[in-house]
């Protein structure tokens, strides 16, 4: 028969499809398996109403056969097959989908299709075969036909359709593989191990058994005996045809059919984790978008989690066929640590399964999963606190950055999941637990920030707050103060840094007395400010300190911990984003009394003392003095 031209598009379009649409050559096998599954679906559906089909559900299968000698890969099915006209229609027109037409007819007939899922975009996925094959041959015998037909093409030049013989109903797709090049090894797709790898990766959950040759080793009797008269055994490699796909996804099974232990084992195998997940979340949603999901909250972060190389996202399936290895659109950034799968028959796919045509369905799924994850984490916090704290110690910072990102858009979602170390209780508490435990006369949520919770709890600035019997939250991550800044308040209680000037702890009488003291010791504070110069924005008499001589507080919106964070950034200007330091003096401390006396009797010595006390305040705040060597010399001068 004369060669026919492709009806829909030119050579250029076919080349564009082959070279551009699919980013991975290996998905050609996924597409051809999906088409085979579609064909079996159709015949299985026919068998429900046509007794002449003569096949039970267990009779259907897909077979993959690699032939290294002839350089061919054959994908066979015993599905409904195609007539010559259907070959013309489905294979001769690029982007025409026979499977799509079948599904529309099925929907229109409003028949019972609970067990019939069509996953193909047949006319498109079929052409992915040309990525690896120099020639594609399709031999198909349609159900109800006595003869078969052969469709053959070597690419965009066209195709031929000729009658041929085939004993059974079904389709064989035979790929004559391209020759290997320096850049591409096409023959690898003929090897049994590679076929198994790709089926496991993309088509493990296709509903029909996929058979292929599997190489195994077995012992055999050599016919020889040893000195003791015992038969000698040898080991040989044998090839047997086996079913290599799981068929029924674990997420499609009920809790009775798949226990939590089964799900955990699945997680460890598929996601290469050695530890049990903190939680397993199962979702079965029906509605505008129907889908099933199985999500896992890991117990530890992947080794590359905090690097640019880490790619978040859930595995996305359509009726058991993997569409994307990692779909980032299914998870908000704040829950990027969650791993798992989503499987939906309702996803709209475009010309390639690797790119979704519309993202509306994904947005609906993502919004629902976000609520499910939040609900599960809230449940853990309430019912299994030890397990939740284990999770939070690993991923709590991620939740905090989730609030900081998008200008606080996720604050309502995440705030109640946060934990901070209580200085009073010496354990992690939520903001709700902190507020519920506050005395009636406590105005603010007090917090202290340092490099570690232990250091934060011991800051000199905490003395006045703790003397009142008020608890303090210990901030120790880069995100903590930014979170407090964005939240502003919780349960109508504002956040207050213990390093702030006004802690709201003084009565009007105490404020008046303090103002009088400030005026009385103004010569001392002026002297220290003049001595320290621009190193401090101000020097004040402290209203916070009890046991320490000095401490640093700040004026303005940038705190000492924020400054530390900004200056740790690559290329940061050390003179930019600086906290406005205020040195506070404790008049009741012997060192400050000695400073004031020296100011009046020996100003030169007093200047040395002022610098030493400032350096001490820096050290207590976790800040290295600008010139440690000078600090050492100043201390020696005082002896």
Each model region followed by its residue ranges:
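GHKL/Bergerat-fold ATPase module in large chromosome/replication-associated machines
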Residues: 118, 139-158, 178-639
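GHKL (Bergerat-fold) ATPase N-terminal catalytic module, capturing the glycine-rich phosphate-binding loop
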Residues: 1-189, 197, 220, 439
